[in-house]
Amino acid sequence: MARVGILLLNLGGPERIQDVGPFLYNLFADPEIIRLPNPILQKPLAWLISTLRSSKSQEAYRSIGGGSPLRRITEQQARELQSLLRQRGVDATSYVAMRYWHPFTESAVADIKADGIDEVVVLPLYPHFSISTSGSSFRELQRLRQMDERFEALPLRCIRSWYDHPGYVRSMAELIAEQVRASDDVEHAHIFFSAHGVPKSYVEEAGDPYQQEIEACAALIMAELETIVGHSNPHTLAYQSRVGPVEWLKPYTEEALEELGRAKTQDLVVVPISFVSEHIETLEEIDIEYRELATESGVVNFRRVRALDTYPPFISGLADLVVASLEGPEVNLDQAAELPTTVKLYPQEKWEWGWNNSSEVWNGRLAMIGFSAFLLELISGHGPLHAVGLL
């Protein structure tokens, strides 16, 4: 029997306060998170932003106990998935590959090779594909395969996204139903889906299917919820965690909550739709910041649906995905990371940016001026980036 490795991809998170700065640096150094036309600026900008945001982020992590629970939860998900697959007759071993903190992808790949795995199923713990989540992890795996002949020779099957998988949809609907039934007015409880946002340009210029998959997923969950509770409920989909002055997917969670507050919403059931584990964005951003905002805006009862974590039907759904991947047609890394052929990933060709040799010189000069302005604002603690909330 072939030995199968299940490679679970996730974001990662700082486990201690002192890890916050390095974690943020790794995050912002990824060109899929901050897209710049000149890659030479990526690391200096990542250092600058992580330095400026570190203190605020540390306070957020202190409010949830001093660190992220993401690694602990993801490793528990991995153990339970491994156990269930072995019960189903699959000789599976699970591995966790975090993108921006330990255990890093390189570590998971080293363990896979050391264990003599015959075949790998790559399963992102992101139900919805995005350039900045699954896409970034897929491209990191592509980079590692190009550098390692042994890893490159290992058969890899990828699961690109699974937002419409019945096991996931049903699990989400069941957990939402728990909070709907606890509401004072079950038929009018307002379901509020809060998804992690991405810049609008990712969707409109780079062809990211994220928004389409999120919207389709919310519709599927609402239909399943209706079969469980026996009635339809009003719902809203909004996007959280916006950073910086650029336009992100709308409506923004903050603005949508304020609007529902003005409407004197009695029962609000908040659903972290793009998160399968408790972490900083559920425990601090939703449970503390958004709860306070909603209450101040006029929402009477704020209920948050728990993350899937190790909910048994959810783990069973993940096992179904793995088995289907092993039995179905192979989806390789290139196919999993692919975007529509009509668009290009950044950076585009020079002529599409209007560049020539002369303009590149000026672009470089302007970039240095801009970076100098960043440093000046870092030293002074004042400036336009502080004013708009980026720093």
Curated annotation (Swiss-Prot):
Keywords: Cytoplasm, Heme biosynthesis, Iron, Lyase, Metal-binding, Porphyrin biosynthesis. Fe cation binds at residues 196, 281. It catalyses: heme b + 2 H(+) = protoporphyrin IX + Fe(2+). Pathway: Porphyrin-containing compound metabolism; protoheme biosynthesis; protoheme from protoporphyrin-IX: step 1/1. CDD domains: Ferrochelatase_C, Ferrochelatase_N. The keyword Cell membrane does not apply. GO terms for cellular component: cytoplasm. It is found in: Cytoplasm. It is an enzyme of class 4 (lyase). PROSITE patterns: FERROCHELATASE. One of its GO terms (biological process) is heme biosynthetic process. InterPro entries: Ferrochelatase (IPR001015), Ferrochelatase_AS (IPR019772), Ferrochelatase_C (IPR033644), Ferrochelatase_N (IPR033659). Its main location: cytoplasm. It comes from the Bacteria. Gene3D superfamilies: 3.40.50.1400. It holds the Pfam family Ferrochelatase. Its EC number is 4.98.1.1. NCBIfam families: hemH. Catalyzes the ferrous insertion into protoporphyrin IX. PANTHER family: FERROCHELATASE, FERROCHELATASE, MITOCHONDRIAL. Belongs to the ferrochelatase family. This is Ferrochelatase. It comes from Synechococcus sp. (strain CC9311).
